[in-house]
């Protein structure tokens, strides 16, 4: 499973990229709004830092508007992936983007039927939201597993991005259940690195070393 970072904060992106594990970035209008910068300017910054997929979301609600926006976004850099909501209009836009060889990430996926529809429309990625399903008492991992099985059984090449990740267990379970990618906030990435026994082990090594001086 690959790692994307879910942020529009350029410092977090640079920090994650320095670790050698970053395969891409996902953004959304809420994340960009927090940064207080021009959307297009920030995308230019991100695409210079990261060579992998950078998802940038359209805000239009009709297919025509999505297509117009998506073309503008795709023109910013060759590694831009246009992020499209899972709606009927979104599917129409995905079909056109697929014909134009513009990569797409269909977001706000909450059931397997939505994922399969998006894939058949030509989506490069689908993004099921784990945390938001947890919030309403549903099991996001069952959804990841179902999508992965359907895609495998029907030879679907669309990749599954586990999104709305809240904690390290989401990452582990997403990998076990067949997600191709986990897109994670930087704070969760930091948590993945940590374990108390690792810290204790490092301290013991240091103490033992220093005791010999």
UniProtKB/Swiss-Prot annotation:
The keyword Cytoplasm applies. It comes from Oceanobacillus iheyensis (strain DSM 14371 / CIP 107618 / JCM 11309 / KCTC 3954 / HTE831). The keyword rRNA-binding does not apply. Transaldolase is important for the balance of metabolites in the pentose-phosphate pathway. The gene is tal. One of its GO terms (molecular function) is aldehyde-lyase activity. This is Probable transaldolase. CDD domains: Transaldolase_FSA. Pathway: Carbohydrate degradation; pentose phosphate pathway; D-glyceraldehyde 3-phosphate and beta-D-fructose 6-phosphate from D-ribose 5-phosphate and D-xylulose 5-phosphate (non-oxidative stage): step 2/3. Its EC number is 2.2.1.2. The active site is at 83 (schiff-base intermediate with substrate). It catalyses: D-sedoheptulose 7-phosphate + D-glyceraldehyde 3-phosphate = D-erythrose 4-phosphate + beta-D-fructose 6-phosphate. It is found in: Cytoplasm. Keywords: Cytoplasm, Pentose shunt, Schiff base, Transferase. GO terms for cellular component: cytoplasm. Belongs to the transaldolase family. Type 3B subfamily. InterPro entries: Aldolase_TIM, TAL/FSA, Transaldolase_3B, Transaldolase_3B/F6P_aldolase, Transaldolase_AS, TSA/FSA_arc/bac. GO terms for biological process: carbohydrate metabolic process; pentose-phosphate shunt. PANTHER family: TRANSALDOLASE.
């Amino acid at each position: 499973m690959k790692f994307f970072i879910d942020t529009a904060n350029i410092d977090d992106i640079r920090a994650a990229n320095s670790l050698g594990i970053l395969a891409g970035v996902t953004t959304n209008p809420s994340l960009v709004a927090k940064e207080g910068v021009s959307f297009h300017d920030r995308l230019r910054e991100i695409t210079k830092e990261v060579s992998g997929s950078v998802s940038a979301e359209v805000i239009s609600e009709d297919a025509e508007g999505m297509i117009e926006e998506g073309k503008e976004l795709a023109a910013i850099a060759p590694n831009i992936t246009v992020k499209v909501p899972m709606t009927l209009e979104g599917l129409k836009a995905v079909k056109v983007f697929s014909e134009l060889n513009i990569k797409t990430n269909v977001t706000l996926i909450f059931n397997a039927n939505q994922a399969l529809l998006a894939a058949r429309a030509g989506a490069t990625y689908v993004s099921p939201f784990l945390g938001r399903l947890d919030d309403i008492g549903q099991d996001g991992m069952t959804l990841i597993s179902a999508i992965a099985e359907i895609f495998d059984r029907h030879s679907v090449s669309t990749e599954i991005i586990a999104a709305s990740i809240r904690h390290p267990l989401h990452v582990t379970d997403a990998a076990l259940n067949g997600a191709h990618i986990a897109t994670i906030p930087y704070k969760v990435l930091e948590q993945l690195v940590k374990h108390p026994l690792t810290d204790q082990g490092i301290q013991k090594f240091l103490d033992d070393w220093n005791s010999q001086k």
